[in-house]
């Protein structure tokens, strides 16, 4: 028996020691990666900025230590790092050109692509060259790579060029199968966010607005490619209608979509020739990560660039399956208050990429931006979306800049409550009774539908919220509420259409927004600083262990286009009942 207990004790001690050693090695690995990531890159003369167009492009990408520890490599591209890196490459005499290598590339929006493309066009003004190569070009990757001086395709490659489509998913019939109905109160003919739960197809109003903004985005894409490749817009549309994705590679060259069919090693020879180096010598390559480690000059006064992207929520929301990054009103308001009090910050650029969310949370952020505006200039730079709640928090700014392909507007709100009575009684066999002290004491119970009187109260509440929203827009844009009503009703616009109706002041990217902020603050010399400041590796490690963001990202990658319907259902019980959000997150393919 003694030997038995000794063996058990030895086994337990061995397991504990092994676990302790693994934890120590894990922490040392994290520390090593943190230190190595902070080292400044040394750029050699006659270098090339090499950009791998694969994975997702989002506003910002934080170093993911959980992904690194799992042995995976993140291919995600930060738009912030892309624009900054290309600008640094333009101004660095040691970097002679850019090499783009296209793969499975999925941007979060065409507005992000447009901003990245404009950065490449600006790079070319320096007289430096861009060479692009791809085994396969997704439509977004081709739009971006079309700026290249020379564009090559693998002899067995493909170009995906087919136009744009938006395909919302409708959940009414699926919910009905489990006895669930959605009760809705909304304001706005075009406020179609609830249609996914109450209908089985797009309304005429939503179909009209979706058609309008898809055509607007596509016109910008074809115009850009037409100018770069010297192919008419009409011809590009013919190519899309012909589904040239399945054309023979040599056809792409005949159609002038590419300059040649080459293998990777042959493209490297082209790059070496441009660098004027011998074929046997290696190319000095620099990555966006390398350039991220090179600090910009911090001469002059500071302009803060604050990134707010994701769903707008109030307080801590569940970290798992939460539609990715969140705009937490409590956190954002505190950050904005800090920027307001920071005497070193002379102006603030708010980079907003959001389809909205909680109407209450949007109002809190709106108030804090109004307070900030009293102290220093505020300029909004819109990303892929700044719609509904995203526009709500943009409205008070001194100046609003949007990309032509930004989706914005959607001025309207809705309330949505599930009726689970059918699920409980018909599917699960549950029965409910109630005792109450007052007439409406049981209001909000999901065990039965609302009474007509209860629904009338809710509708009045929604109407009041809609009037508040319009009032905020009217104040910020210096319009009458009648003028706002004419362009509201939940209507979604592209940035270029929003400019025509004065919802935005200027078309362009974040660089224009920064320049405008400097002008409003009367700054001749200035530098920018990005906020929120990325958390240190240990905080990030703890957050990822507690909030399960790592699992969220893995599920997003696994489910692909099915991730959104999954989260729509998952979030029904967690999201605020009163919402100011875009009709749906368009899966633009």
Q: Residue locations for each model-derived region?
A:
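Short glycine/threonine-rich loop-to-helix capping motif typified by GTGT followed
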Residues: 359-364, 497-500, 542-545
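Intrinsic disorder and flexible/low-complexity segments
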Residues: 300-303, 307-343, 461, 532-589
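Acidic/polar loop patches that form or flank catalytic/metal-binding clefts of enzymes
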Residues: 278-285, 346, 402-403, 432-436, ...
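C-terminal long alpha-helix characteristic of the crotonase
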Residues: 227-228, 259-302, 414, 470-476, ...
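Cleft-lining beta-strand/loop regions that shape enzyme active-site pockets
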Residues: 40-42, 47-168, 297-423
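Charged, glycine-interspersed solvent-exposed loop segments at helix/strand-loop junctions
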Residues: 172-270, 421-501, 505-506, 511-516, ...
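Flexible, low-complexity junctional segments that flank or bridge functional domains
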Residues: 2-48, 59, 96, 122-129, ...
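Short, membrane-interfacial amphipathic segments enriched in basic
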Residues: 1-2, 76
């Amino acid at each position: 028996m003694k030997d038995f207990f000794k063996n058990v004790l030895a086994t337990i001690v061995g397991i504990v020691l092994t676990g302790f050693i693994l934890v120590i090695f894990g922490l040392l690995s994290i520390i090593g990666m943190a230190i190595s990531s902070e080292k400044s890159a040394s750029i050699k003369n006659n270098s090339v900025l090499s950009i791998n167009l694969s994975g997702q492009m989002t506003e910002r990408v934080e170093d993911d230590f959980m992904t690194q520890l799992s042995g995976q490599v993140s291919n995600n591209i930060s738009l912030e790092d892309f624009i900054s890196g290309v600008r640094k490459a333009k101004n660095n005499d040691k970097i002679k050109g850019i090499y783009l290598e296209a793969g499975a590339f999925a941007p979060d929006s065409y507005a992000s692509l447009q901003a990245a493309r404009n950065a490449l066009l600006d790079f070319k003004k320096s007289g430096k060259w861009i060479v692009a190569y791809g085994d396969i070009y997704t439509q977004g990757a081709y739009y971006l790579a079309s700026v290249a001086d020379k564009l090559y395709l693998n002899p067995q490659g493909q170009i995906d060029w087919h136009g744009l489509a938006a395909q919302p998913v409708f959940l009414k019939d699926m919910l009905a199968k489990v006895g669930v109905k959605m009760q809705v109160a909304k304001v706005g003919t075009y406020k179609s966010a609830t249609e996914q739960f109450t209908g089985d197809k797009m309304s005429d109003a939503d179909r009209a607005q979706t058609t309008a903004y898809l055509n607007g985005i596509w016109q910008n894409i074809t115009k850009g490619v037409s100018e770069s490749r010297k192919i008419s817009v009409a011809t590009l549309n013919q190519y899309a209608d012909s589904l040239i994705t399945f054309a023979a590679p040599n056809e792409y060259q005949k159609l002038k979509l590419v300059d040649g069919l080459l293998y990777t090693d042959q493209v490297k020879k082209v790059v070496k020739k441009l660098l004027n180096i011998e074929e046997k010598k290696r190319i000095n390559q620099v990555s966006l990560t390398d350039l991220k480690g090179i600090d910009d000059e911090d001469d002059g006064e500071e302009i803060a660039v604050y990134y707010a992207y994701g769903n707008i929520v109030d307080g801590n929301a569940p970290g798992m399956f939460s539609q990715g990054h969140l705009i937490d009103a409590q956190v954002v308001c505190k950050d904005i208050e800090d920027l307001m009090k920071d005497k070193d910050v002379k102006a603030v650029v708010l980079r907003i990429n959001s389809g909205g969310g909680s109407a209450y949370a949007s109002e809190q952020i709106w108030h804090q931006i109004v307070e900030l505006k009293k102290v220093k200039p505020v300029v909004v730079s819109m990303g892929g979306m700044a719609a509904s709640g995203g526009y709500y928090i943009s409205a008070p700014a001194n100046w609003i800049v949007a990309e032509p392909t930004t989706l914005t507007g959607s001025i309207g709100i809705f309330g949505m409550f599930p009726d689970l009575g059918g699920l409980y009684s018909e599917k699960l066999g549950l029965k409910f009774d109630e005792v109450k002290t007052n007439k409406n004491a049981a209001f909000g119970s999901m065990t039965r539908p609302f009474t007509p009187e209860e629904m009338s109260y809710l509708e009045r509440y929604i109407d009041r919220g809609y009037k508040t929203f319009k009032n905020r827009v009217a104040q910020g844009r210096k319009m009458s509420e009648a003028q706002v009503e004419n362009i509201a009703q939940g209507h979604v616009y592209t940035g270029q259409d929003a400019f025509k109706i004065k919802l935005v002041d200027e078309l362009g990217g974040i660089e224009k927004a920064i320049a405008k902020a400097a002008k409003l603050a009367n700054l001749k010399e200035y530098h920018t600083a990005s906020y929120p400041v990325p958390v240190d590796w240990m905080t990030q490690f703890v957050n990822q262990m507690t909030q399960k963001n790592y699992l969220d990202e893995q599920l997003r990658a696994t489910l692909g286009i099915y991730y959104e319907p999954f989260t729509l259902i998952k979030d029904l019980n967690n999201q605020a009942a009163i919402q100011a959000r875009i009709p749906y997150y368009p899966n633009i393919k």
